[in-house]
């Protein structure tokens, strides 16, 4: 499938490197420039367009609100407009960070739950989802992922981030193994699925649990201190950092399509083993 991928960051490069999207074009054009978006799509003539572009740094979004809205909201709408004109399927990478908590009965938030964003980044992602959905384009697929990780040595990789901290929260979270996200995207496109899907691995895990597994696997001397979410909130407020959310997402809708999603703890171990091969 000839695919045009917007965004040369962690997700975009991961998609482009996958055999499932072999031959795709990875574009770094400014998605806030509608003319450039149209030119890129018309030049490459893809069969599907995937938007992985976006601003994800919470503090940057808070301090640069207009720019954050341009990239996280206006940009995806420009891509949608051109895709609709050319009758092309569009996949938009969204975020589960538009929720906080465990959802009804502790089973995680479903795609139908009303977003309750707690920081400006989350607000921009929730707004984009709302406006994209209200456009009622029949070939739109929105995927909500959460704390993406893999075996890649990349500063955006959740595992890389976790291992760089000394204090880590013990509360469980939903997380997304990037190779599984890519597989799910290919599956959903082939199955002609549309609408919003939560795409996370089965089960939940805390950042502290990841560090404990890594410490044992790598025989690390680094000490990791477990802290509560409340303690993290106090530290972030003290250091003028944006609010971080704990979020559980429900993936029943995804599983109902027939896609098989691996357990998150297994994928964390898989990612750590892959990452260990790149260590000196």
Regions found by a protein language model. Name each.
Residues 1-19:
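N-terminal Rossmann NAD(P)H-binding glycine-rich loop of SDR-like oxidoreductase domains
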Residues 10, 29, 207, 227-253, ...:
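Active-site loop of classical SDR/Rossmann-like NAD(P)-dependent oxidoreductases
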Residues 63-91:
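NAD(P)-cofactor binding segment of oxidoreductase domains
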Residues 70, 75, 98-143, 150:
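Catalytic helix-loop patch of NAD(P)-dependent Rossmann-fold dehydrogenases
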Residues 130-183:
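NAD(P)-dependent short-chain dehydrogenase/reductase
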Residues 191-239, 276-280:
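Mid/C-terminal beta-alpha module of Rossmann-like enzyme folds, strongest
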Residues 262-280:
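Amphipathic terminal alpha-helices
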């Amino acid at each position: 499938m000839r695919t045009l991928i917007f965004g040369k960051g962690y997700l975009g490069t991961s998609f482009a490197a996958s055999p499932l999207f072999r031959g795709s074009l990875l574009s770094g054009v400014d998605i806030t420039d509608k003319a450039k978006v149209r030119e890129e799509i018309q030049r490459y003539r893809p069969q599907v367009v995937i938007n992985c572009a976006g601003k994800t740094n919470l503090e940057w979004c808070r301090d640069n609100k207009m720019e954050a809205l341009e990239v996280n909201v206006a940009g995806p709408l420009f891509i949608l407009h051109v895709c609709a004109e050319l009758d092309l399927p569009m996949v938009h990478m969204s975020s589960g960070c538009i929720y906080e908590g465990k959802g009804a009965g502790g089973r995680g938030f479903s795609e139908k739950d009303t977003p309750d964003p707690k920081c400006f980044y989350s607000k921009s992602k929730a707004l984009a989802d709302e406006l994209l959905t209200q456009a009622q384009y029949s070939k739109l697929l929105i995927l909500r992922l959460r704390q993406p990780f893999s075996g890649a040595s990349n500063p955006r990789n959740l595992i890389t981030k976790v291992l760089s901290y000394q204090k880590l929260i013990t509360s469980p979270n939903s997380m997304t193994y990037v190779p599984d996200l890519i597989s799910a995207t290919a599956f959903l496109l082939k199955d002609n699925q549309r609408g919003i899907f939560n795409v996370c691995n089965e089960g939940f895990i805390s950042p502290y649990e990841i560090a404990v597994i890594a410490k044992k696997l790598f025989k690390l001397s680094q000490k990791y201190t477990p802290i509560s979410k409340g303690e993290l909130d106090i530290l972030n407020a003290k250091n003028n950092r944006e609010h971080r959310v704990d979020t559980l997402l429900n993936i029943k809708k995804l599983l109902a399509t027939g896609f098989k999603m691996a357990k998150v703890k297994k994928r964390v171990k898989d990612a750590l083993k892959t990452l260990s091969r790149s260590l000196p």
